[in-house]
């Protein structure tokens, strides 16, 4: 079972990241809510961060944002996926999967408006990573991202990487027949059927009642890669896949083998020692900064190497 207790305690212990002050402002575009962390309006890089399944950007991701935004040339945008958090849309569903992918274009365009000269990077955690893989390989996007970070990515049942857990220990429980009917109908039937249940502990829901506990077929299809091996192989932008060594959902070794087997010259693998599926959010910032440093000029290589793993 995912260790929510550890995550909540860690989030409390961090408080406001002391590595440097970044201004935070809230924004909204086409019903999408986002929070922007930055030092100046002239940032050279902006990282757009997408949360994991059922939660929203307020679920500890501000710690990651402040860690990253301690780099003065870098801004961070935390987004609530449509149907989550403060974004509009019926909770846990969407009229069609493509709407979620189009929303990434909307946010990237908004970041281009705010930072005309900045490079734009996408970071997805868990199901947010699966969604970004779909966006980059299944949607004819109008915007261009400069790099991608997949943090403890949930690549779905077609990746073959899930741990063999008892039903009571699984975070997500799935009814298969609505997905089958939806696929056979070309997406016309049962798109709004609530086919996925997310098993948040009662204490977590008491503290965060806005978490989404059920996903429709359409929402699940938006977040879940259909052919993850082929989709990973199709990536053509600098990509870092970060695995959590103590991930409760899948083993880091299986993720590494998946990258070695299906990745390409653009895809690198990194391991976050001691991290769980959730706590990796607090441990990823140095790897992310190094990834951007290697792909593009940001800060000082020597300075970042001093912080790195």
Label every PLM stretch briefly:
Residues 1-39:
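An N-terminal hydrophobic leader/cap segment in hydrolases
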Residues 235, 241-243:
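Short beta-strand/loop motif that positions the catalytic acidic residue
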Residues 69-88:
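Conserved alpha/beta-hydrolase
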Residues 248-254:
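Conserved alpha/beta-hydrolase "acid-adjacent" motif
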Residues 54-66:
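The serine-hydrolase catalytic nucleophile loop
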Residues 125-217:
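Alpha/beta-hydrolase-fold enzymes
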Residues 54-57, 85-111, 115-119:
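Catalytic nucleophile-loop/oxyanion-hole region of alpha/beta-hydrolase
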């Amino acid at each position: 079972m995912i260790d929510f207790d550890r995550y909540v305690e860690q989030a409390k212990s961090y408080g406001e990241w002391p590595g440097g002050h970044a201004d935070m402002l809230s924004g909204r575009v086409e019903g999408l809510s986002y929070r922007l962390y930055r030092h100046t309006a002239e940032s050279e890089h902006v990282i757009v961060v997408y949360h994991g399944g059922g939660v929203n950007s307020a679920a500890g991701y501000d710690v990651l944002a402040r860690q990253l935004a301690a780099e003065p040339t870098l801004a961070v945008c935390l987004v609530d996926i449509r149907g989550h958090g403060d974004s509009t849309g019926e909770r846990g569903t969407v009229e069609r999967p493509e709407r979620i992918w189009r929303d990434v274009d909307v946010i990237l365009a908004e970041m281009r408006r705010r930072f005309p000269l900045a490079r734009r990077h996408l970071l997805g955690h868990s199901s947010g990573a699966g969604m970004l893989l779909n966006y980059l390989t299944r949607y004819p996007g109008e915007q261009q991202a400069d790099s991608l970070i997949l943090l403890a990515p949930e690549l779905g049942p077609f990746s073959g990487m899930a741990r063999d857990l008892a039903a009571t220990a699984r975070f997500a429980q799935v009814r298969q027949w609505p997905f089958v009917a939806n696929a056979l109908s070309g997406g016309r039937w049962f798109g709004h059927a609530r086919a996925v249940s997310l098993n948040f502990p009662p204490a977590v829901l008491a503290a965060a009642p806005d978490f989404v506990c059920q996903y429709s077929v359409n929402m699940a299809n938006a977040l879940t890669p259909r052919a993850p091996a082929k989709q990973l192989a199709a990536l053509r932008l600098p990509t870092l896949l970060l695995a959590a060594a103590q991930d409760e959902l899948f083993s880091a070794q299986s993720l590494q083998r998946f990258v070695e087997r299906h990745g390409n010259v653009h895809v690198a693998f990194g391991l976050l020692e001691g991290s769980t599926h959730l706590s990796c959010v607090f441990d990823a910032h140095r790897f992310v900064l190094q990834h951007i440093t290697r792909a593009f000029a940001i800060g000082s290589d020597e300075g970042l190497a001093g912080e790195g793993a």
